[in-house]
Amino acid sequence: MEGWRISHLNEHKHERTIYVDADACPVKDEILSVASQFQIPVTFIASYEHFQTKRSPLEDWRFVDTHKEAADLVIANSVAAHDIVVTQDIGLASLLLPRQVIVLSERGRMYTNETIDFDLERRHVSSKQRRKGVYGKGPKKLLEEDKKRFIAQLQKILSNHEGFLN
């Protein structure tokens, strides 16, 4: 009976997944490439306006309404500890970090518990400036070196968490 209980519990073990806030994500192909190296499933969350078909057996697409927080809510309700989320949304990152989710920007920057308060403060200051009519240049164009940094960081995360060596 004891052996049954152990195997029964193992059947319900969570499989690590990469979730992608996909509407404006410029590194979808890079995510799929790295995920295939590690055989990690990827779930892309996007609005119906960004409908895509599946290109790999490791990928899954979930489509949501066009409401600006719809994808964030699906991601927040789907993730488990040690899953990986790729997003540029600092607010979403701040919700996921306390749940032991690994959060990575599209440029390869990891959001951490140590840096998230600063990121939120910077976002707040920028928002106040925009309300006053002061607009910055916006984000810099994503360069090939940014994509390489992202790939290296995702490979490092998966290597460390899957027991592989760099």
From Swiss-Prot:
Family matches, as InterPro entries: UPF0178
Superkingdom of origin: Bacteria
Pfam families per UniProt: DUF188
Family per record: Belongs to the UPF0178 family.
Protein's name in the database: UPF0178 protein BPUM_2255
